[in-house]
A protein has these predicted regions:
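Walker A/P-loop NTP-binding motif of AAA+ ATPase domains
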Residues: 1-154
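Conserved AAA+ ATPase small/helical "lid" subdomain
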Residues: 123, 144-175
């Protein structure tokens, strides 16, 4: 809703880079050893892409807290053990990555400190201010006056994603 994914895509566009997006939900498998293979496979594919491309692509983990979250101590369940093993593999891969890694999350407080240390830059995107919200309303809904867009920006402290959802819903309701 605040533009994390869009910022990544615009950064890639502006720098002429491809984005290798990881669907975090597809990493976790109920089958023993499959998640670990998936993670190792992701980094192998990314390393191969880096060798083939003129410009290094961006490795993009959206909603990264699902796999970069705080590790558990004294784990007894097989699911928790699998997640800890998965996280250890991720930590090893991140130690040696030669590329551009971007991770997004709405829950930065849930990230494991070992992962956080490996992120050189941390950028927090807040909800847009009143003026930017007015511009977002204007870009998504045509036919209103500047004063009306300003009023919407003032009245509704929404994120860009929330504004987009309101506009979509109103379009569907109109139909």
């Amino acid at each position: 809703g605040t533009g994390k994914t869009e910022t990544t895509l615009q950064l890639a566009r502006k720098t002429g880079r491809d984005v290798f997006t990881i669907d975090v939900s597809k990493i976790k498998s109920k089958w023993v050893g499959e998640s670990e293979k998936a993670v190792k496979g992701i980094f192998k594919i990314y390393r191969d892409l880096c060798k083939k491309k003129e410009k290094m692509p961006i490795l993009f983990f959206n909603e990264a807290d699902a796999v970069f979250g705080k590790r558990m101590e004294n784990v007894e369940s097989s699911a928790a053990q699998m997640l800890n093993t998965l996280q250890n593999i991720l930590l090893q891969e991140l130690e040696s990555i030669e590329g551009i890694l971007i991770c997004t999350t709405n829950l930065h407080q849930n990230l494991d400190p070992a992962f956080e240390r490996r992120f050189i830059y941390k950028v927090e995107l807040d909800k847009p201010g009143e003026e930017v919200r007015s511009k977002i309303w204007a870009s998504m809904m045509k036919g209103y006056t500047q004063e009306e867009y300003a009023s919407l920006g003032r009245k509704y402290p929404f994120s860009g994603g929330q504004i987009e959802n309101v506009v979509r819903k109103s379009a569907v309701d109109y139909i």
